[in-house]
Amino acid sequence: MIIKILDPSKNATYLWLPVYFYDEPFQFQILSSIIELVFYISCFHLMTISLYVMLKVQIFHRNLYILYIPMFCVWYGLIAGKLITIAYRLKFVDLDYELGEHIAMWTDDQAKMLHVSSLRGLELLIFGGFVQWHYMYTVVYGILGVAAERAIASVLIENYETNTQLYIPIALTIITQFLAISTSLSVLFHKASVFLSHLPWIISCSLGALAYLFIKIVNENFQKQITNPRRKRLFTISQQFQVKENLRALRLGTRLVFVVFFYVAFVSFGMFALAFDLVSSAYCHFVENFLFLNPYPICFTAMLTIPHWRKHFQNACFTWRLVKSAWTKPKTSTTSVEISTTKKLEAETDLYFRQLNESWI
């Protein structure tokens, strides 16, 4: 959605928001919003359970958690931004004009822009758009930050596990958040072109791929040395654990990369199809919600990849317990028979020993 602000001097200012509004009957908008809220609540449950399991069963280094957790937590802000959009869509926020249909991610067509003379009443919508941009770029830069942390851990293998200093994850978190916020503001206020807005994830993916190869080669080499009985280098227990941790993180990261690539490919195709009117505007609902519902494939992939996480996730997940209880055969009758049999044997045993005791008196 592009907002064009015309001041009295006829100078135009543009705002670029990643929000969508549809030209649909109001009843259908209510229905679609209810369906979206149901999926968001389910996704909220899944995300919360995943965070709980990751914090309860900590199988990675503390520094990795300091980088990972904020990336997951900003999803809650993303949903808050979406709820603001729904409030405007259902006209819970009163405006003096109609917002109209806005399904183009970016456009130069003046007819597809929202023309206003003031931002009065649009403050919440702008904030919601910023939150959504911030989430996207937090993930983009956050992945690069995680890759950098694992690369540093591979280089500083001598004492990284035993080092209690937090300056590395804190510095990486500050840098990634600074980049995410500054990039989000630049895109929001249209200080960056369409190409520049895509440049961060292109650079991050390229650097992340190089970091992935570096971490993989270095740690596989360490693993060969550890398993070699004739090795000349001595690896401490903490260093061996760190190598296994890096390889475990790579296995998890590889699966997540395929999931993210599928997501990016689907959304990119959807945006391309919408831009050239290859599909109807209703398809935009699916493209938009693919961003908000990304915890479904990501959390399931993460939770089911790590065996320790899988067990606790299945026990904590409400949906899993419902399915498990539905497919589990009731054992009430068998249990009652076993209990009655046990009590009968106990009574007979007590009677036997009482009779035996009395016979010796």
From Swiss-Prot:
Topology versus the membrane: Multi-pass membrane protein
UniProt xrefs under InterPro entries: 7TM_GPCR_serpentine_rcpt_Sre
Record flagged with keyword Membrane: yes
Pfam families assigned: Sre
UniProtKB keywords: Membrane, Transmembrane, Transmembrane helix
Superkingdom as given in the UniProt entry: Eukaryota
Subcellular location: Membrane
Biological process (GO), any one: sensory perception of chemical stimulus
GO cellular component, as recorded: membrane
TM annotation in the entry: 34-54, 66-86, 124-144, 168-188, 195-215, 256-276, 286-306
Lyase found in the keyword field: no
PANTHER family listed in its UniProt record: SERPENTINE RECEPTOR, CLASS E (EPSILON)-RELATED
Stated family: Belongs to the nematode receptor-like protein sre family.
Protein name: Serpentine receptor class epsilon-32
Organism field: Caenorhabditis elegans
